Amino acid sequence: GSRAPMTVELSPKIVTVMTREDIQRSAAQTINDVLKLATGVDVRQRGGFGVQTDISINGGTFDQIAIFLNGVNISNPQAGHNASDFPVALADIDHVEIIEGASSRVFGTSAFNGAINIVTKKASANGVEANVEAGSFGSLGAQGRLQMAFRSGKWEQAYSVSGGYKRSDGGTENSGFEKGQGYANLSLSYDRRLDIGAQLGIASQSYGANTFYSAKFNNQYEKTDHGIASLNVSVHNQGRTWEVTPAVYYNKFKDHYQLTRGK
């Protein structure tokens, strides 16, 4: 295996691509809902709306997959339980690529059973999106996205920024949650020979972890924070018969757990 560009038809592994049209038809509310639709992917949620989710492929464990955002590894090296702390919202996503089968040689040791790559939308025009939702048990959510696209000579520029918030008191004891995320993306292209991409994302959530880790304790609590940043450059000819792609990225998690809430 290699990271060389390749079509789905030529790939030696099973590759599933969930397009934006697939996502819209599915009526999914979270990224986890989208992943549930893929054959071979097992998604097990302990809480509602994507709160702490175990994601596995082909019968493996949640620690045996690698998760990428626009090709940047955002997996949690500490615990796969928090792999679903995505710094992007469903509205940001263009498509999701799922590779089934051992991929450690290409994507690192965590990709023992496969890999998931979330690809965000690239702005092609100026636009604004916003939505607000409310429901029972004190549920409330809001999401907004701003995008801009410009062309100046041989330069193409695309910018997008988004943010979201969701909370609920929960339908059972100690099952409430509060979560938020923010994401920004920059894309520059010159004459189909140079591409520069940068992204910055944060996600934070706190929730009642009722019997998450032990049935004896129903007043558990957990708070997680996830931050990512990356910069990548691609230098290539117009036919992309050769390509050089240096990249740097930052990926940090913080996890605070209380066996008994408030103690």
Placement of each model-derived feature along the sequence:
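Extracytoplasmic beta-strand/coil segments of soluble accessory domains associated
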Residues: 32, 36-76, 94
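Membrane-embedded beta-strand positions of outer-membrane beta-barrel proteins
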Residues: 35, 116, 128-132, 159-163, ...
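Flexible loop and strand-edge segments within Gram-negative outer membrane beta-barrel domains
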Residues: 168-175, 179, 193-244, 250-263
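N-terminal periplasmic "start-of-domain" segments of outer-membrane beta-barrel proteins
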Residues: 1-24, 54, 183
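Short acidic/polar hinge/loop motifs at secondary-structure boundaries
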Residues: 54, 72-100, 118-121
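Non-catalytic regulatory/gating segments with a bias toward low-complexity or hydrophobic composition
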Residues: 23, 35, 96-97, 116-118
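Short strand-turn segments of transmembrane beta-barrel domains in outer membranes
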Residues: 115, 120-150, 162-163, 168-175, ...
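Outer-membrane beta-barrel channels and translocator barrels
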Residues: 62, 123, 151-155, 189-193, ...
